[in-house]
Amino acid sequence: MLNIEINSKEYNIPNKWEEMTVDYYCGLLEIIKKYQITEEEEHSDNDLTKYRIMQENKMYKELLIYMTGISSDKVVHIPMNDVSELIKCVDEIIEEYKPKGMDYFEFEGDIYYFPMDFLRTGTFGDYIESQQLELNTQYLKNGRFDILPEQMAILCKQVDEEVDLDNIDEKAKKFRGLTMDIVWEFSFFLNKRTLASINVIKTFSEMAEQKVSQ
């Protein structure tokens, strides 16, 4: 945690992946995306120097408000050394995550496993999981981290836990409290399993076609 004192009040700001929840990170991403230069603006003939500076200043102001909870009228009075620390914190957050090869995680006293074995059994439940893997990969490509808690609630299970799509909301809500190191590990796991999931979908599709043709 980054510990800073502003106007005699101490603030603890998450600056490591294992310290921030999915919800917190999604909030940061939304602000950062809001002030990105669009492709159309990038390729325009206009000089964007001044505009870039204005957008960056607005972005950092909104990020400071989000990270500290300080009102917009008070944020302008934050000492520059504290602002520099917060900006450094943001820069660290958007650096690339280095995976450790995790295939399970502990959360609120329970152990959940990534879907490692679905290729071995070949059940319809495994087919559902393979579809979720493919769907998750598309979400990640589009930066939709906000969707991942629900998808992880479906795919990441305790030993002998069954997939129950009708009662997944409570688990998904709980998983919004997962920290980003776990979510990143899951995303890297997905990238490795995408090809396998496509093969499973293809296999089940071929089986269905054979059934129809018989």
Identify the residue ranges that each predicted region occupies:
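Charged interaction scaffolds used for protein-protein
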Residues: M1-Q214
